[in-house]
Amino acid sequence: MFLQIAACFTVIGLLYGLVSNLQQNRRLAASLPPGPPGHWLFGNVPPKNFPFIRFAELTEIYGPVFTLRFGRRIVCVVGRHQAAVDILVKHSAETTDRPRAIAASEMLSQGFRILMTPAGERLKKYRRAFHTCLQPSAAATYKPIQYNHAKNYILDCLHDGKCHLEHGRRYAASVVMYIGYGKTTPTSYSDPEVQEVNKCLGRLSEVIKPGAYLVDTYPILKHIPGYASHLWRYGREELALYTRQANAVRKQLEKDEAQPSFAAYLIENQERLGLSNDELAYLSGAIFGAGSDTTAAAIAVMTMAAACYPETQARVQAQLDEVVGSDRAPTFEDEEMLPEVTAFVLEVYRWRPVSAGGVPHRSTKDIVWNGYVIPKGTEIIGNLWAIGRDPELFPDAEEFRPQRWLNENGRIRDDLKYPVFGFGRRVCVGQHVADQSLFINTALALWAFKISQDPAKPIDVLAFTDTANIRPLPFTLRFEPRVKDIEAVLEAHLD
């Protein structure tokens, strides 16, 4: 009897949603930016694979901003740089919000994950907490640990280049475990706590993809007994994991054995920050979620680009030889004198952006753009893949060309920007730490090695995972030492 009643209410709810959807679509269609036609009732079908590539194709057809409709959801996809500035930067106050993400946020993350936290008091206190530990001055204090782990990455590649992807993941995991929880010993990607966190992140990458779960289009499904019950179970497992990690730091603090860390800061200031135990656990775990997989993927893209574009690699190495030489390793203090390295990093971000599809925003007011009206409640996606292929700013976009970031004096251009870390008030709070990681790993890798492809196993530069944050599929590299006694030079500088 209960199931019959539930089914009846489900049908009624779906019918109501469909009728409301039809009325809404007729009212809004005239004012929205154009887009591909869809079913008169259900709208468009979400792309099954690599949505950011399909959205980039639609940008070529319909222009800088186009509209999709998924049931009652209206989605505007932004695929050009100036349109992104006009909508997501100039209207930052009206686009700080996130759309309701029932599967990924409410069910999988129990509403605690900062990535999908809507605008409001929780987001404000989350960002206040992050600001203290990730602002530029705080990020600079992590440089010594980043430097030493980057040197270990080079030594790992020297001794076992076949596992270069694993070495990049180890670097990223070691740094974020230090920042997040104060762990000072080298971290392996195979460590149990790292594997558990990465399992959670893998689940998120699948759930957050557009169209992955019908409940995001028809919210009533959330209340159907048994629907996607595994998401609730995964959410409980994830919260338990982050709680265990935070509690371990609590015990260290009680014994006066804790290293400085983000988790320790949150615990010591929990009352002042107004954080519940669950919020604190999720927030401390967010450091790993935001910084591990993304940093490792970007390092992999850096080595891929170096191998596939040897002339570009050689240009960076010429400057490294001039500024640094071979008697010592490059350091953060050399950054100002190494614009070729910085340009290489900026091009890595643009060429293969890890968060290629961007994270959706939600408008809280009507936004007028180029005569169109993007109504309140619209989901707005800044498609980083398409924006990085804006022909007005990035001609020959598929070419990896760091020189596009340099002016006639060989310095980094002030007039060219790429929003790899997001837009407006939702920009990634860990951007400064990420920039530091990419700079020092790029400088050390190109100083130490000539990186090349294996002729028997050419690299497919489009072979990436189909996940929310993309990463290269396994590929083979050769690491030929450029510096005599690399190990001795590096170990002489290891702290």
Curated annotation (Swiss-Prot):
Necessary cofactors: heme
Membrane topology qualifier: Single-pass membrane protein
Location in the cell: Membrane
Superkingdom in the source lineage: Eukaryota
Disulfide bonds: none
Residues the entry annotates as binding heme: C428
GO terms for cellular component: membrane
InterPro entries cross-referenced by the UniProt entry: Cyt_P450, Cyt_P450_CS, Cyt_P450_E_grp-I, Cyt_P450_sf, Cytochrome_P450_fung
Regions crossing the membrane: 2-22
Gene3D superfamilies xrefs: Cytochrome P450
EC number(s) from the headed UniProt entry: 1.-.-.-
Pathway per the UniProt entry: Secondary metabolite biosynthesis
Molecular function terms, GO-annotated: heme binding; iron ion binding; monooxygenase activity; oxidoreductase activity, acting on paired donors, with incorporation or reduction of molecular oxygen
Keywords: Heme, Iron, Membrane, Metal-binding, Monooxygenase, Oxidoreductase, Transmembrane, Transmembrane helix
Enzyme class of the recorded protein, top EC level: oxidoreductase
Similarity remark: Belongs to the cytochrome P450 family.
Function according to Swiss-Prot or TrEMBL: Cytochrome P450 monooxygenase that is able to use 4-ethoxybenzoic acid as a substrate for oxidation.
Protein name as annotated: Cytochrome P450 monooxygenase 113
Organism: Postia placenta (strain ATCC 44394 / Madison 698-R)
Gene this protein is translated from: CYP113
